[in-house]
Amino acid sequence: MAGNDWINSYLEAILDVGPGIDEAKGSLLLRERGRFSPTRYFVEEVVSGFDETDLHRSWIRAQATRSPQERNTRLENMCWRIWNLARQKKQLENEEAQRMAKRRLERERGRREAVADMSEDLSEGEKGDIVVDHSHHGESNRGRLPRINSVDTMEAWMNQQKGKKLYIVLISLHGLIRGENMELGRDSDTGGQVKYVVELARALGSMPGVYRVDLLTRQVSSPEVDWSYGEPTEMLPPRNSENMMDEMGESSGSYIVRIPFGPKDKYVAKELLWPHIPEFVDGALGHIIQMSKVLGEQIGNGHPIWPAAIHGHYADAGDSAALLSGALNVPMLFTGHSLGRDKLEQLLRQGRLSRDEINSTYKIMRRIEAEELSLDASEMVITSTRQEIEEQWRLYDGFDPILERKLRARIKRNVSCYGRFMPRMMVIPPGMEFHHIVPHDGDLDAEPEFNEDSKSPDPHIWTEIMRFFSNPRKPMILALARPDPKKNLTTLVKAFGECKPLRELANLTLIMGNRDNIDEMSGTNASVLLSILKMIDKYDLYGLVAYPKHHKQSDVPDIYRLAAKTKGVFINPAFIEPFGLTLIEAAAHGLPIVATKNGGPVDIHRVLDNGILVDPHNQESIADALLKLVAEKHLWAKCRANGLKNIHLFSWPEHCKSYLSKLASCKPRQPRWLRNEEDDDENSESDSPSDSLRDIQDISLNLKFSFDGDKNESREKGGGSHPDDRASKIENAVLEWSKGVAKGPQRSMSIEKGEHNSNAGKFPALRRRKIMFVIAVDCKPSAGLSESVRKVFAAVENERAEGSVGFILATSFNISEIRHFLVSEKLNPTDFDAFICNSGGDLYYSSHHSEDNPFVVDLYYHSQIEYRWGGEGLRKTLVRWAASITDKKGEKEEHVIIEDEETSADYCYSFKVQKPNVVPPVKEARKVMRIQALRCHVVYCQNGNKINVIPVLASRAQALRYLYLRWGMELSKTVVVVGESGDTDYEEMLGGVHKTVVLSGVCTTATNLLHANRSYPLADVVCFDDLNIFKTHNEECSSTDLRALLEEHGAFKA
């Protein structure tokens, strides 16, 4: 292609740089001046959303080529590259539009089906927009208090709370968290969320009625970060709390508690923490149990003080909080801060990356699944703004605003929701600490003076900033954000550089975190910073723009004060801002604001009315708003006054009052067996039950000897009854039956003594075991389960004979199938201490008390997992879904999925799969249930031939945590034995503080069938480099080889 010099001009137009551009040439925004260039408009549209840095670099290299022919060839290739990028972007946009249309149809269909199920008693009241908040348990909120706006009301409320002594757990996992000198902006993980959770913990700990607050995070003992992040515990002293902490206890107050998990001696990004979440959950569980006992001794009369709530912040902490709340049976709260689906849609709209590339970079699908689980498990979701609910949470399968209003209306009328649940969305704006704010008492109409009297030196950070300016007395436009593309700082610099009146009237200060060397920054942040530096050079902004390299967190108030002293303006031009805490800080220092119209700033501006909202994509709008506030003194003064007048509405006491009032509306929950023990003062104990007469009587009272439950009988007589009612009836019946045991204590004692001497009274023997082996090999009994069991038994034969090791069988089978397996393989039920059945839906223990029924079901385990169990309403929806699979696939000759009533149980609905290859992946089944507000855990098992549906927080891994909580079974002294693959809950069994042995060559057939079409690859959630996960060397591994492997990895001493 000869003579194509036009290409260079074309690229110059795209990049707006190069020798062909001079000062007389118009800016990119020709439309500002009333002229319109179709060519320029096309160029802007083509490269919209693409990073210009790479294009600029390629263009420079092409320009430097001496040979005209080679230069033209390179430039032509660049044009084709740009065209291809635009084509890919358009293709991605079309695919995304189709996906969104499909999603809308699925949601509408799910909503119609849910409404149809509940149509028996619909009324006009459900059709209105009911705004009264109720808990999902149907309790009224008469005890909830109005918003406090006066000192008298606040004092009255504080006096009312003094009798309470709450223990609250907050979780925020990623970033670097400490109480003082926070390194905000150090990296993308250490931002506003870190400051928010620290200040929230500190403020809650200062409130009346709150005894202790623990902020759980990751312990980082790495040479690349400060030593303080490796300290196990850090106290957060309260600020200005003379009137709020009248009664201090030994362990009261707020604390940062750092739990070790993940790579040791290494600080890693949040995207790499997902495989280590189970390890954190196990460590946090141990801390909470220990702290509950300590607090019980101090303020609970010897009874454990369980958390009033566990509050997860961001998706990773939400996932952890869900597992912890399920293990402890306590309420969960969630705050998203930044949501995965919203980020995914933004990245797809930009067109730079495909969906697979986005997932690979950000682990976005794992993050979204964690957020969906948080919706499933949360009693309440706390948001900063209404926009977060209406535009971001509604993107999720588990939340539908329309269906949520209908469910709320039914709860208000005390009408059944047929097993459907929706978390309550609560808007509680973040608070702010005002103790460090020094009001500006000077004459606001006078010229700013900087240390002219030398009575007190100016803050050091003022000098650092003003050294950049040729005229430091001009009003300062202040932006405080890390150099992240979504913060949109490049558009701000471009708007400032292209608006001559603004440059003449004001200076620009960019506080972009801390840096030592640009080359050592992350690639994205370095790219943004380089772009800004190039624009400063391009527009010749030297002497007009400050960009200091370092600042401390304690310098931030002084930076705001400097901007206010110069009668400046604070700007947040982010493309979307979840809340905008810096806007509140700026307002508190008397700074008017210019902020993005997308997200939380809309709500802040509605309350404060102290500035102007702008379109972050329109640099002309940004420049005009800044110029207006800087040039019009009366407007500036009005915005300043409005902000200072209304800022008290964002104080931390106000936030905490709303927080605690909402928390009071949640139904209290705690481990059921401990609650019953506390009701009986004669037999109450602070610790888990011990192996004594008291425990044997408890077992007889609280555990039903059974081999095959009467599951179908309750369904025939009225399956709509709540699981609580059925459990209570069973327990009452067993109570009546066991009266004879209570009347004969002497006989019971002699039985216990005899059984103990003969080693027959084994239950609950798992407390006495030094090591527990959990066999969770997911294959048919005839296909390797029996061989695996015998191999493990043989590997620890000596310890097994001594009784120092115990065994648990964890499978998808029900208790009938397990008994058949034991009989057929000539194994004794007492070879195992416990049986986790139905994928975690049931828990049994072996017993010596009855040869006919050698299994004891733990009814309290049911009370632990029944949270949000949909019961008969869920079962009917599952049956309808199973029937729809047949219709959609056109398989008229036989059903693809049929209900298996024989193997179903009260807390596990089972389905037989006739054609595993036809059934949609498990993620689709979970999606269908969530769209209809049904919360459950769907597990594809037995190589795809069976589906188990159990309560949302039930699983085999959670059952192990229950055994730790109730019986003290040490998870760190547990070995889980699995195959190379397994059921769809396989990944949950791998991570944690326990050791995991992967048997080579076992359960290999399930890999492609069950784990195809996963939402995310297994490597995103399992760290196979973990030292606690080890694999046998070959398929022919003998029991001797297994023993040697266990000794090598520290399970046994050699």
From Swiss-Prot:
CDD domains: GT4_sucrose_synthase (cd03800), HAD_SPS (cd16419). Pathway: Glycan biosynthesis; sucrose biosynthesis; sucrose from D-fructose 6-phosphate and UDP-alpha-D-glucose: step 1/2. It is an enzyme of class 2 (transferase). Its EC number is 2.4.1.14. Residues 104-115 have a biased composition (Basic and acidic residues). SUPFAM superfamilies: UDP-Glycosyltransferase/glycogen phosphorylase. InterPro entries: Glyco_trans_1 (IPR001296), SPP-like_dom (IPR006380), SPS (IPR044161), SPS_C (IPR035659), SPS_pln (IPR012819), Sucrose_synth_GT-B1 (IPR000368). Activity is regulated by phosphorylation and moderated by concentration of metabolites and light. Signal peptide: none annotated. Keywords: Glycosyltransferase, Transferase. It catalyses: beta-D-fructose 6-phosphate + UDP-alpha-D-glucose = sucrose 6(F)-phosphate + UDP + H(+). Residues 104-125, 674-693, 708-727 are annotated as: Disordered. GO terms for molecular function: sucrose-phosphate synthase activity. Plays a role in photosynthetic sucrose synthesis by catalyzing the rate-limiting step of sucrose biosynthesis from UDP-glucose and fructose- 6-phosphate. Involved in the regulation of carbon partitioning in the leaves of plants. May regulate the synthesis of sucrose and therefore play a major role as a limiting factor in the export of photoassimilates out of the leaf. Plays a role for sucrose availability that is essential for plant growth and fiber elongation. Homodimer or homotetramer. Belongs to the glycosyltransferase 1 family. NCBIfam families: sucrsPsyn_pln. This is Probable sucrose-phosphate synthase 1. The lineage of its organism: Eukaryota, Viridiplantae, Streptophyta, Embryophyta, Tracheophyta.
